[in-house]
């Protein structure tokens, strides 16, 4: 299909620098960030796994994972109709229809949509902000992506636990200041935090992201991995980040 038929007015086609894959995005709506890239590389996806991406946005995580993992199939769940449409067109553009299936729906309904204990891995880059005060328009795409408007942290963790097979992993990126709540909620829903990695914008700055792996019905033992530093200086990525694009 010609590019003009896939990419619409106001949209752009971005090179993911992996296996020739591209993604369709609309800068006025919402574009993926570094958190999605880091989460894709943090997730340890085993060969022939069935994977669910909860809150896929425009589908960047399953597309990246098609390039860097041997998973057999990805289901991707997204509530926003426009994002579902863009994600579906990106999947088609990359010829990945046999590996990625996009479904419109709410994260809090994931187990009703897909069934219980059916996935080998769940990956999620959920809304980070639980304070809805000051939102001028809670229906704006960027607000929905960033704020817990249609699902809460507990919804995300509960549904991940419900759809995961025993001893299988949830991979999540979130904000460090919510770690106590994240860990407590995970353990309430039979998810044991097993691996954690903090992400710092600069070596002298506090972390602004945290990558977490939790295992359903896992044994208590948390491994804290070396931190990721994103920038050496303003506008210059560290070698850690540059290596992700090799």
Residue ranges and their predicted role:
Residues 206-246:
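SAM/dcSAM-binding transferase cores
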Residues 150-201, 205-207:
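Conserved Class I SAM-dependent methyltransferase catalytic core
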Residues 126-155:
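Mobile active-site "lid"/loop adjacent to the S-adenosyl-L-methionine
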